[in-house]
Amino acid sequence: MIGRAALSGLLVAFAVSCGGSGAGSVRTTRSATIAAVIKGLDNPFFATMRDGLVATAGQHNARLRVDAAAGLQDTDGQAVTLESSATQREDCYIVNPINRTNLIHPLSHVREGAPIVNIDSPIDQNAARAVGVKITTYIGTDNVAAGSLAADAMAHLVPRGASVAIITGIPGDATSEARARGFREGARGRFDVVQTIAADFDSERARLAAEDRLRANPPIQGFFAVNDQMALGIAAAVRAAGGSSLVAVTGMDGIPDALAAVKSGAMSATVAQYPYIIGQLGLEACLAAMRGKSVPANVAAPVQVVTKENVERARANFPQPVDPFHDPLARLLKG
């Protein structure tokens, strides 16, 4: 894996030769460059995504520039970064927006015909089309389905009819909302979601929210956090209250600290995403599109539930999935 030292703003350069004459194919008069603008590397999920982008660029001898936002709420800064990248007239853009609309305006300024690959957090397609921005493909987790998987895991951890709380991220964040919606849908007839609390994807805020909820009525028997950083904060609150064996804590993302917490019993489960694979698929989609290949409009990234039963394999395989994953884009890069 690429080291955790910040690569934001650095050009990871490899020789590249990309042919193809289809719509949006890369110019062949010079080395082609792929620009990636992602969320903040203060979250290990996005640092791992960066690693997947960089490693895959190396495997395919691609020329890649990666820029990251200063933090998970740096919407304006991320947009300015992409605006600057757009002036460089890169040949393909990979974007991981902080919200559904903050990158639409700068995307309207990218070179005509340059493919735009949207990874992880979806762009508002209607708003994008309104200003002439065409998204080549979206690659990411089906977050509603992932939330439902988290509910399945919770149903095996708490009694029927148990009281469970959801800890969400930043209000209005599409990913957070989709995960919470999937969890609520999966909870029906199995356990009761009695409260939803926003903690802005922040571990400390989630810890404080969990402390408050643990003191309230009715007694809580489970927490679902829409990301692992918040789940770790909740786990700390549950442990401090002496309820580790009584209150289930499930998260989502499968970051290394969460896998360690599942192994120790501090967390009950996490629905692992694979940001390394999302980065890999994003880079592959750019290469395929630049070669004039037809890339699917939507590519689902893998998700897998990690519990005490399979956490050792999950840790051994990280950042790859627990179980084998079929890469749907690999065939487009052959030959």
List each language-model region with its residue ranges.
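Sec-dependent bacterial lipoprotein signal peptides
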Residues: 1-16
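A residue-level marker of the well-folded mature domains of exported/periplasmic proteins
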Residues: 18-335
